[in-house]
Amino acid sequence: MMKPTQADCDIKVRYFMPLHETDMCMHATVGSVTALVRRGICQTSPITLETNLGSMRVDWEMRDEQIDVAVEQFLPQYQPTAPTVSEICQALRIAPEALTGGPIQSVSTSRFKLLIPLISKAVLDHLVPDFELLWSLCDRYETTGFYPFVLGTDHVLYARQFPKRAGYDEDPATGVAASALAAYLVKYRQVTVQNGWNCFTIFQGEAMGQPSVIYADVFVEENKIARTRIRGNAKML
């Protein structure tokens, strides 16, 4: 975090993984804003962050000693091509029957993630990918990771995130992927959609013993996606 170069921004943020810089990271944003508020550096809401992808609004609210952070994302984009079912099954080491038959697509509200609907949480929890093949497919289809997921009830989902050559094989919390997933669910009407905010709860990291919960929201206006955001909170260690 540093001084902004844009006059309309409060703080400039850059994000780094072990192997490279990345343009956007939601859990780092939630954690950073939490730290700024706790230390008294950030005293008003909202604030505007300068990122590699442009300016980004962040709202925060103190609630029962917990800081709730809401990070605006961008309008969704959709990749026109995706790996074949055969390629996905080879990379995830699953049978085709483990897929629901729903759309498989790379979606982005800041960074592209390949969204893959699976039939059960048991299948999700037991995934042991072929990472070299997975990374190769990410390169070929211009996406930054695989995000297999299972749709539960009441807008609850379970997911895992396997990033492309990040320096680690799996991520316990991926807000950019959760935001893309929420937009995907609304676009393809995989859930009941209403005008106004459509709110989703995504559980991630359980299979790796680092559980997290991410709140992803999509605002629909005149049956079109008008806004996306991620909500969450962090603990200071």
PLM region descriptions:
Residues 1-24, 30-237:
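Active-site proximal loop and beta-alpha junction motif in alpha/beta enzyme cores
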